[in-house]
């Protein structure tokens, strides 16, 4: 199942993501990353190979979360204590090495969290 946050504006190849998800052994959750964009906050991803070791809003890395992820709800319900908070879910998945990051990145990606972001959006998606 794909999950996208409502503030995402993107051009992404879902077939490539699906292929990557199966190549990685169908983890419980796989996050789709992007290169950081100046002026946009995000959860920076720290990983070994494609297994996420940690996420940070303060310490920067070369990629961060887009808000796009592939989830397997059955595996989540079978292996993870119930929560309504994605940050808690991610921490629990990190603990059992089931939070992966994809090798596939969107061709274009942006998030619109405020009016300034909306104004910049037109420049990016011409």
Where are each of the predicted segments found?
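Catalytic-core segments of class I nucleotidyltransferases/pyrophosphorylases
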Residues: 1-2, 9, 18-22, 35-37, ...
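Short catalytic-loop micro-motif centered on adjacent basic/acidic residues
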Residues: 3-5, 30-31
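Nucleotide and nucleotide-moiety/phosphate-recognizing core
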Residues: 14-16, 25, 47
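A short, conserved acidic/glycine-rich loop-to-beta-strand motif
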Residues: 24-34
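Short acidic-glycine loop/turn motifs at beta-strand connectors
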Residues: 45-51
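Glycine-rich, N-terminal phosphate-binding loop of Rossmann-like dinucleotide-binding domains
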Residues: 12-13, 33
